[in-house]
Amino acid sequence: MEKEQLPELKYINVNDFNINEKVIGIPVQTNEVAKYMKMFKGLCYNRIKTKCVIPYNSERMILLETPLKEQTQKLIQDNHLKTVETEVPLTIKNFNVNEIMKRYINKNIQLPSSFETVGTLAHMNLKEEQMEFKYIIGEAFLIKNYPRIQTVITKTAEISNEFRTFPLEVIAGIPNTEVTVICHGVKFVLDYAQCYWNTRLETEHIRIINQMKAGEILCDAFAGVGPFAIPAALKGVKVYANDLNPTAVKYMRINAVNNKTTIECDNMDARDYLRKIVLEKHIQPNYILMNLPATAIEFLDCIPELYLQHCMIHCYGFSPLPNAEDLKKKAFELLKGEYPITIREVRDVAPKKVMYCLSIFIESTKHLTSGNNVPEAKKTLN
């Protein structure tokens, strides 16, 4: 099978790295290679995708880290070993990503060291001083990670819209932001430029889904492309899912089909959606998910007008306070009462910004609803 062709590079010239590197080696007999490799452990030539033992005449030569360290010189002298200067032909594959970047970037610029992987896409958060060299950085990471990574992007501004997406730029590779991600055996397709996705929440998705049983009903008010909804449906949960982002809903429907499961999807405001599910369709969910940490807590204000029974609400939010006491207070204000609540830290997002999950058990909201609004509820599947 032919190796996949690296996408066209515009800023890095791979020929810049076609050099012969001068290295010092010690000729040894073939049957003594193991002995001297042990003696010079940690002192041998160690460039990536090269060998430190090469043929030499009819014997072998052990290549050493050059220039020679003081310890290496002493071992050579004490063991009366001969040294030979040779050259190792190198290409760009023999250089690590930092070495490639340093070839073009001012040494005073801090180099990026990591990225988030989403399918075949690498998401980098470059700092302001790195943006001048963004295309060099992107191509360097592409070269060293291709074909596992085929597109490199960087965020160009913070999240500022209701869909939780952010402005981004493709800085290397194929200009395509549609990716396929597999999480715990479930395949998701999404356009990363137009849909929210966070790989770091994979464990949280599974933790919540593990609480559910086949035959129960889930109402996911901010479902995105379906990271909660699809695995829940595969478990036998009846899933009603909604998102305000029409592109996310499009991909959620695609993901349901691809995973051979069924979800009832809507594209509307979350408050209107919850009213539709409970008050108009007379559906009683066992679980309501509200995963929009920036504003989800505000949507609890519609819960009192619904007729809910034995419903667990998982609502996510950000707080700078230990135990998210501010979120708890706000939740009870909007719910017009105090309910059993468990607050759990999900992850640190930034200094003094922690993501929490508020799990609120609603025994009944009947006392808060007018008689005209109380529907005949369906709690489990027929």
Curated annotation (Swiss-Prot):
An example GO CC term for this entry is: nucleus
Q: Which family does it belong to?
A: Belongs to the class I-like SAM-binding methyltransferase superfamily. TRM5/TYW2 family.
Sample GO molecular function, one term: tRNA methyltransferase activity
Q: Which Pfam families match?
A: TRM5-TYW2_MTfase, TYW2_N_2
Keywords attached to this Swiss-Prot or TrEMBL record, sorted alphabetically, are: Cytoplasm, Methyltransferase, Mitochondrion, Nucleus, S-adenosyl-L-methionine, Transferase, tRNA processing
Record's subcellular location:
Mitochondrion matrix; Nucleus; Cytoplasm
Q: What protein name does the entry list?
A: tRNA (guanine(37)-N(1))-methyltransferase
Q: Where does S-adenosyl-L-methionine bind?
A: 205, 243-244, 269-270, 291
Q: Does the keyword rRNA processing apply?
A: no
* UniProt xrefs under InterPro entries: MeTrfase_TRM5/TYW2, SAM-dependent_MTases_sf, TRM5-TYW2-like_MTfase, TRM5/TYW2-like_N, tRNA_Gua_MeTrfase_euk
Q: How does it assemble?
A: Monomer.
Q: Which PROSITE patterns match?
A: SAM_MT_TRM5_TYW2
State whether keyword Heme applies.
no
What is an annotated GO biological process for this record, any one? tRNA N1-guanine methylation
Chief subcellular site? Answer: mitochondrion
